[in-house]
Amino acid sequence: MTHWIAGEWVQGQGEEFVSLSPYNQEVIWRGNGATAEQVDQAVAAARAAFVEWKKRPFAEREAIVLAFAEKVKENSEKIAEVIAKETGKPIWETRTEAAAMAGKIAISIRAYHDRTGEATREAAGNQIVLRHRPLGVMAVFGPYNFPGHLPNGHIVPALLAGNTVVFKPSEQTPWTGELAMKLWEEAGLPKGVINLVQGAKETGIALADAKGIDGILFTGSANTGHILHRQFAGQPGKMLALEMGGNNPMVISDNYGDLDATVYTIIQSAFISAGQRCTCARRLYVPFGEKGDALITKLVEATKNIRMDQPFAEPAPFMGPQISVAAAKFILDAQANLQSLGGESLIEAKAGEAAFVSPGIIDVTNIAELPDEEYFGPLLQVVRYEGLDKAVELANDTRFGLSAGLVSTDDQEWEYFVDHIRAGIVNRNRQLTGASGDAPFGGPGASGNLRPSAYYAADYCAYPMASMEGQETELPATLSPGVTL
């Protein structure tokens, strides 16, 4: 069974689609997508469940969420294995994701109390009480790169606030979405509070268009997010929160400190998860001169030694394949385009079996106008520069604004960087990936519009209600002109 609607597992009535393991192209999941009619049924079930769910005391909603967290802990190895098979990420990495699925629930609970509680103040003789109320039915769109952890960062805050959910996983990771839904079922979630619909583009469009949806929490590519944004232009009554990608700059100062530590930080920033994290470094700014030359030489040498293999291989690999053969081709095509524009490959990314692509580094200093695209994979562009102010100017030349970083031991350089860079997440002397659930996650421009993840998701799962409360109705000393009593 593919879909969970109104507390029942049902078969999809749309077109068949499959999940292919990206490291060997074996079919590991098969099902039929949800039709528009089935999506409407899921939304109706969520709407019906919302009536009672929002009335439940917070303690009851919290208890069910905590029961789910326990189920995740009990099944953490199974979750890690499923994610590894669907995404191709090394098992050591997917184990950290399984742990985060349960671990960040505590952040969401704390956020509910911190950001959606009641507050009272006096003003002009009135008592002003700020309360928070759930929006209603939330559509949650999950990405393929973190198919367990990231959707959870939307679903849990939505439920805690009293909303109900229709969840659509990525069509490339349906097995993970199905497994998570089964754990919610085992945790005792009432019927209709979460509904799972699977499918590709048609299912997603139907969900975004559904009249019973009050808000969308989306994590995914900029292209898909912008389609949703245009789709919402005629639906002002819906809340839309987008978390999208970035063309993230990483600036290396002449004062970068330890060479090996700097190279390791770059590799972790650019090639972790085979470059398939939205915060990965895409552009590396390296100063002209001997220190910059030494850095690039060491980086190229270390990158050649990166172990790439299947997720369960021994010894353990650092990175696996791209999510699909099409995604692998996209990276190779991007590299070819940069080469045609004048880029010089320091290491050429090469296709392997199935969806594997080896990491590539390309010097694009001589390209006058770099394509402002998110190359979601292991392709790092190097730009040589002179002067930190020039590096920051080049780094800001993008429509995105998610993540940025500076490697420097100089405090004044850091102050200049953090004051002038345009990014929502800024890092000093650490990898660009691996943001904290306690911090806002997102950025300006094409990287998104809100910060609906983990701690700050509470802001978008409930609306503030301000009530001005007087002790009794009072007649003013002076009536408004034209009124006689």
From Swiss-Prot:
Which Gene3D superfamilies does UniProt cross-reference here? Answer: Aldehyde Dehydrogenase, Chain A, domain 1 (3.40.605.10), Aldehyde Dehydrogenase, Chain A, domain 2 (3.40.309.10)
Quote the catalytic residue positions. Answer: E243, C278
Domain of life according to the entry: Bacteria
> What pathway or pathways are given for this protein in its record?
Amino-acid degradation; L-arginine degradation via AST pathway; L-glutamate and succinate from L-arginine: step 4/5
* Entries under PROSITE patterns matching the protein: ALDEHYDE_DEHYDR_CYS (PS00070), ALDEHYDE_DEHYDR_GLU (PS00687)
Residues that hold NAD(+) according to the record:
G220, S221, A222, N223, T224, G225
Write the record's keywords in alphabetical order, separated by commas.
Answer: Arginine metabolism, NAD, Oxidoreductase
Q: Which family does it belong to?
A: Belongs to the aldehyde dehydrogenase family. AstD subfamily.
Protein name, entry field: N-succinylglutamate 5-semialdehyde dehydrogenase
Protein species of origin: Vibrio parahaemolyticus serotype O3:K6 (strain RIMD 2210633)
